[in-house]
């Protein structure tokens, strides 16, 4: 679950205040104009920014002041942040062990994660040999390896064409079902999510102004 109670961020250009209640396992889309506060909302939940006041509860624990690594959250950005000199396997390994010195069990987990996103045969490839959609699949698999119950997506597929976006969104829905993930997804294409989202939040001027159920 995700619960934000009067979470205030004193941004110089746009003061923000968020109240939010998302049940465990729900899938939520976040829409709004550029600069409205969508990414800031995710950053507050992930721990990349800290509020001036208010509380952030994640899975029944107060994480208002927790460091990002202490939170039950993984976050995927538009930039896939893959290291070009490392193979797919090594990039995935960074999700669980930065030293890249893996046990047999950890290696098996990496192979399973790669297979879950359709890249089981790409482990020895370098990122520059992958398509944009394949790179995002690697980044998604790395998030899943962290084994966190809350997944935050900040427009990760906006640079892809519509066909690839639809494929990636279908993959996300499948993985959420399999792993019982709670999902928050910032998007500019809410129509592509019809049938796979529990609610849509509209962020305007640093606040959640609307909530639509059952999209």
Curated annotation (Swiss-Prot):
Under catalytic activity, the entry for this protein gives: thiamine(out) + ATP + H2O = thiamine(in) + ADP + phosphate + H(+)
- The disulfide bonds in this chain are none
Its subcellular locations are:
Cell inner membrane
Q: Where does ATP bind?
A: 32-39
Membrane topology recorded in Swiss-Prot or TrEMBL: Peripheral membrane protein
Gene3D superfamilies from the UniProt entry: P-loop containing nucleotide triphosphate hydrolases
Enzyme class, top EC level, equals translocase
What does the entry list under GO cellular component? plasma membrane
Enzyme Commission designation: 7.6.2.15
GO-annotated molecular function:
ABC-type thiamine transporter activity; ATP binding; ATP hydrolysis activity
ABC transporter domain boundaries: 2-215
Its keywords, alphabetically, are: ATP-binding, Cell inner membrane, Cell membrane, Membrane, Nucleotide-binding, Translocase, Transport
Any Pfam family: ABC_tran
* Family the UniProt entry places it in: Belongs to the ABC transporter superfamily. Thiamine importer (TC 3.A.1.19.1) family.
Per UniProt, subunit arrangement is:
The complex is composed of two ATP-binding proteins (ThiQ), two transmembrane proteins (ThiP) and a solute-binding protein (ThiB).
The job of this chain, per UniProt, is described as: Part of the ABC transporter complex ThiBPQ involved in thiamine import. Responsible for energy coupling to the transport system.
What name appears for this protein in its UniProt entry? Thiamine import ATP-binding protein ThiQ
Q: Which gene encodes it?
A: thiQ
């Amino acid at each position: 679950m995700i619960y934000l109670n009067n979470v205030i961020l004193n941004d110089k250009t746009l003061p923000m205040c968020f109240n939010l209640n998302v049940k465990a396992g729900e899938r939520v889309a976040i829409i709004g104009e550029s600069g409205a506060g969508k990414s800031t909302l995710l950053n507050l939940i992930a721990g990349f920014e800290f509020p001036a006041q208010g509380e952030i509860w994640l899975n029944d624990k107060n994480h208002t002041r927790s460091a990002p690594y202490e939170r039950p959250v993984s976050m995927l950005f538009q930039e896939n942040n893959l290291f070009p000199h490392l193979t797919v396997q090594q990039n995935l390994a960074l999700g669980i062990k930065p030293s890249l010195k893996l046990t047999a069990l950890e290696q098996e987990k990496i192979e399973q994660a790669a297979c879950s996103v359709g890249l089981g045969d790409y482990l020895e490839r370098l990122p520059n040999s992958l398509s944009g959609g394949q790179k995002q699949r690697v980044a998604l698999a790395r998030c899943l390896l962290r084994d966190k119950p809350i997944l935050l997506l900040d427009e990760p597929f906006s640079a892809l064409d519509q066909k690839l976006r639809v494929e990636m969104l279908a993959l996300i829905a499948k993985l959420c079902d399999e792993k019982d993930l709670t999902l928050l997804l910032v998007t500019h294409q809410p129509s592509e999510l019809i049938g796979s989202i529990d609610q849509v939040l509209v962020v305007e001027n640093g606040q959640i102004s609307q909530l639509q159920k059952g999209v």
